[in-house]
Amino acid sequence: MAGRPGYSEVIFLYVVSVAVIARATDNMPVNKDVSKLFPLTLIHINDLHARFEETNMKSNVCTQKDQCIAGIARVYQKIKDLLKEYESKNPIYLNAGDNFQGTLWYNLLRWNVTADFIKKLKPAAMTLGNHEFDHTPKGLAPYLAELNKEGIPTIVANLVMNNDPDLKSSKIPKSIKLTVGKRKIGIIGVLYDKTHEIAQTGKVTLSNAVEAVRREAAALKKDNIDIIVVLSHCSYEEDKKIAAEAGDDIDVIVGAHSHSFLYSPDSKQPHDPKDKVEGPYPTLVESKNKRKIPIVQAKSFGKYVGRLTLYFDEEGEVKNWEGYPVFIDHKVQQDPQILKDLVPWRAKVEAIGSTVVGETMIELDRDSCRDQECTLGVLYADGFADQYTNDTFRPFAIIQAGNFRNPIKVGKITNGDIIEAAPFGSTADLIRLKGADIWDVAEHSFALDDEGRTNCLQVSGLRIVIDISKPVRSRVKKIEVMDYTNPKSDKLKPLDKEAEYYIVVPSYLADGKDGFSAMKRATARRTGPLDSDVFKNYVEKIKKVDNLKLGRVIVCKGSKCT
């Protein structure tokens, strides 16, 4: 950490669900000599999310006003440099998943462009992220096949195929075995075990992550593997749980999913000071048999490349370590060949994405969507409702905040903006749902998920009052609705829990994903057009966005709620 072997100011001791602060030097050798120990260097990235082009510091599109950082050409160059620099310390490059989704590059070019650049970086092992399922197993299968042809293994110990037809020929082992410097190393892949609830996994489900890691690690130990790495796409908090409850045989966890920036308290290494530090790099967690398991993660979007060097004794126990997340700032050179390789892909993206479809006079915000009503969500919901509106019928619209990925700035709105705003490829489905179920959906939107986030509904045709001072599942104070049989009236009346209402929702939501199980109680459902087409058509119809009626979702406390 911060380049000093064995240093860490703080560890998180995770036992059951209690975090205890302790000195990281506990049980560390007084003698810092590592000459008799076996070094293993882990170079790792996670949650790239299609950031092939350079980005600004916020990991959005880099403009002429910005100082550009990251980008696949810089990431490639830095990984190549680190592999060479630590050649004598047995370097292994790992990719912890979620390479799909996040920019127009993926939305237009899908697995093809992703596989092309992953092949060039060629990790020793990869695991899957939840976003690799964004276009169902059918959209994942050719990606896996392409990587497999290049000898790049994708490993997931807790993947349950359930005879999914699209993945039946895909090779996804639980782990791989490597011989590095005459030492036998096992790498176990694991994916967040609720992925089938938040992604379009088809028949595929995920078994308990802790149990899967424990079981596979024990099997590797029986096969005389003495160093075991867990390559996890489960989140920082879940990785702590894995270390505490399944850490008897594992040695280190390389993580992903939560986009966590880990950075040691006294490190002098370059970084973006605006990046919130969630814990030290590495974070140490004590297992049930009192072993300390290091956990690392390298934030997201190619902004950092992690580098951790571990030192093992003859028994395969970690005795020392050093490393830090390497900041991929503007000073990092871009690999010239990768820059050339980007050119033909960029031409395809620009040809489709640059078409202007409208204009906005206000910023269409995405960052606040999870906690409250947001301008992007309101406009999107209005577009959904408009899709099915006629002279005598105007349905409501409900969209979950997690549907949105990128804001739209003031100015021209391009086809690229439309797709990047909500890039998941849902359809705009018309459903019929009972009032009581709508109430349940609203309650769930302000119940925290596993990452401690709300999922505020973005709505059209409704007014919802949320009192966040109340207990979870008792926060909805009031829901009022417009008369969907009279499109010209803006009058609101109380929701009737016994009545049925017509609502337009993303197909993802209609399927009950993100925990919105009440949606599956719909008594009728009509599959609609692609959501991005609906949004595009609505923007083209209104031409200019300059006035949105807000106040549809009121988030308040106690006496301030009306």
From Swiss-Prot:
Changing residue 361 to K: In strain: Rockefeller. The N-terminus is blocked. Changing residue 498 to Q: In strain: Rockefeller. GO terms for cellular component: extracellular space; plasma membrane. One of its GO terms (molecular function) is metal ion binding. Its EC number is 3.6.1.5. Disruption phenotype: (Microbial infection) RNAi-mediated knockdown does not affect dengue virus type 2 replication in salivary glands after infection. A divalent metal cation 2 binds at residues 98, 130, 233, 257. A divalent metal cation 1 binds at residues 47, 49, 98. Optimum pH is 9.0. It catalyses: a ribonucleoside 5'-triphosphate + 2 H2O = a ribonucleoside 5'-phosphate + 2 phosphate + 2 H(+). It is an enzyme of class 3 (hydrolase). Changing residue 224 to K: In strain: Rockefeller. Induction: (Microbial infection) Dengue virus infection does not affect expression levels. AMP binds at residues 370, 405, 424, 514. Its cofactor is a divalent metal cation. The record marks 131, 134 as: Transition state stabilizer. InterPro entries: 5'-Nucleotdase_C (IPR008334), 5'-Nucleotdase_C_sf (IPR036907), 5'-Nucleotdase_CS (IPR006146), 5_nucleotidase/apyrase (IPR006179), Calcineurin-like_PHP_ApaH (IPR004843), Metallo-depent_PP-like (IPR029052). Glycans are attached at residues 112, 390. Female saliva (at protein level). Female salivary gland (at protein level). Not detected or low-level expression in female carcasses without salivary glands. Not detected in male tissues. Patients with dengue virus or Zika virus infections during the acute or early convalescence phase have higher levels of IgG serum antibodies against the protein. This is Apyrase. It comes from Aedes aegypti (Yellowfever mosquito).
